[in-house]
Regions:
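Terminal membrane-anchoring module of integral membrane proteins
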Residues: 73-76, 87-93, 159, 177-348
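Cytoplasmic, membrane-proximal interface of class
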Residues: 15-20, 44-50, 209, 215
C-alpha cells in the first residue's frame, strides 16, 4: 500500500515539475497529487496511533453494547443506522468518481496525468502505459477504500461520542424514575442513595466521554488539518479543470469527484457540529430532570454537570479551527476565491 501510494506521488510530482508554468497542465496534475498527499498523512497518523484508536473503539463499544433499557437500545441503533447510511452514500459517490476518472480518458490520452521516463503518447508505449494505468487502478481502488475508511473512522468515533452523550442526557431525564417520594415531594432517604449513585455514575460517564473527545483530537488533529488545507485547493482546481473538459463522461466523473471531496470535508464538519449540539443537550437534560425533588448534595452534582457543559465540547484542528459547519462554509468560500483567481490568471 505504501509502495503504490509512494510511486504515484513520485510520478505525479515528476509530472508537475515537468509541466511547471503551464497552468492548465499543472492543475491537471495537482488535484490527484494533493488528494494522495492528504491520504498519506491520514494513513500515517492512523498507523502511528492505532493502539490508542483501538482503545477508544473498545471503550465506546463496551458502553454502547451494555445498554439494557429499550430507549437506550433504540438510541444506539439509530446512531448505527445513521453511520451506515453515511458510509453507503460516501463510498458510492467516491468510487463512482474514481472509476469514472480512470476509464474516461480521451483518445490518445491517459486517464490521469503522470510522469514516465519515456514518451507515453506514442504507440505501443501508450497502450502499455494505459494497460498499466488500468492495472494500477485496482491498487488505487484499494488505496481509495482505505482513504475513505480513514474519514469514516473519524466520523464514526465522533458519532460514538455523540451517542454516549445522548445516553447520558436520557439518564438525567429519567434520574428519579422508580424512586419513592414523601408527602413533601422530596425523595426518601433510601431513594437518595439510589439517585446519588446514579448521578455519580453519570458524572463518571460524562468525564469518560470528554476524555475520549480529547483523545480523538490528539489522534486526528493533524490529518484533519491536512484534509482541510488540501480540500479547498482540490475543490477549486477540479472546478477549473471541468471548465476545459469536452468529454461528457469525463465531465460527469470529475463532477462526482468534486462532490466526493466536498462530502469528505462535510462529514467532518457536520460531525463536529452535532457533537457540540449533543453536548449542550446534556446541560438541558440536567435542568429538565426533577432536581427539585433531590437534596442539596445531589443538586450540587447536577450543577457541576451543567457548569461543565457551558464550555462547548468541540474538536479543533491544531487547536486553531473548530470542526463545524461554519468551517465548512469557510472552506467552500476559500475554494471559490481560489477558483476565481485561477480563472483570472488563465485569461491573462
Amino acid at each position: 500500500m505504501y509502495y503504490v501510494l509512494g510511486v504515484y506521488i513520485i510520478i505525479q510530482t515528476g509530472d508537475l515539475v515537468q509541466v511547471w508554468g503551464d497552468l492548465t497542465l499543472m492543475t491537471a496534475s495537482v488535484f490527484m497529487l494533493f488528494t494522495n498527499i492528504a491520504y498519506a498523512i491520514k494513513l500515517a497518523c492512523v498507523i502511528q496511533r492505532r493502539e490508542l484508536i483501538q482503545k477508544i473503539i473498545f471503550d465506546g463499544d463496551n458502553e454502547l453494547d451494555g445498554q439494557k433499557t429499550k430507549l437506550a437500545i433504540q438510541t444506539v441503533e439509530r446512531y448505527r443506522k445513521d453511520t451506515i447510511r453515511l458510509v453507503t452514500v460516501y463510498f458510492s459517490v467516491a468510487f463512482s468518481s474514481v472509476f469514472g476518472i480512470t476509464f474516461s480518458g480521451e483518445k490518445d490520452q491517459l486517464p490521469l496525468r503522470a510522469w514516465y521516463p519515456f514518451d507515453a503518447t506514442k504507440r505501443p508505449a501508450y497502450q502499455w502505459t494505459y494497460a498499466y494505468t488500468i492495472l494500477f487502478f485496482i491498487a488505487l481502488s484499494i488505496n481509495a477504500a482505505v482513504n475513505l475508511c480513514c474519514d469514516v473512522l473519524v466520523a464514526a468515533l465522533i458519532a460514538q461520542c455523540r451517542c454516549r452523550l445522548r445516553l447520558i442526557a436520557q439518564s438525567l431525564r429519567t434520574l428519579c424514575d422508580d424512586v419513592d417520594v414523601d408527602k413533601k415531594g422530596r425523595i426518601t432517604a433510601d431513594s437518595e442513595k439510589v439517585v446519588g449513585s446514579r448521578v455519580r455514575s453519570i458524572v463518571m460517564r460524562h468525564q469518560l466521554v470528554l476524555a475520549q473527545v480529547e483523545q480523538l483530537q490528539q489522534c486526528f488533529s493533524v490529518p484533519i488539518l491536512g484534509q482541510f488545507a488540501v480540500a479547498s485547493f482540490i475543490i477549486c482546481v477540479t472546478a477549473y479543470q471541468m471548465a476545459f473538459v469536452t468529454n461528457l463522461y469525463r465531465l460527469i466523473s470529475m463532477a462526482s469527484f468534486e462532490i466526493a471531496v466536498t462530502i469528505q470535508v462535510y462529514i467532518y464538519c457536520v460531525a463536529g457540529t452535532n457533537l457540540t449540539i449533543d453536548s449542550d443537550e446534556v446541560s438541558r437534560a440536567a435542568y429538565e430532570c426533577p432536581w427539585y425533588e433531590c437534596p442539596a448534595s445531589i443538586r450540587r452534582l447536577l450543577l457541576v454537570i451543567m457548569v461543565r457543559c457551558k464550555r462547548a465540547t468541540v474538536i479543533t484542528v491544531a487547536g486553531i479551527v473548530e470542526i463545524s459547519l461554519d468551517t465548512f462554509m469557510s472552506i467552500m468560500k476559500a475554494s471559490y476565491t481560489f477558483f476565481t483567481v485561477l480563472q483570472s490568471t488563465g485569461e491573462l
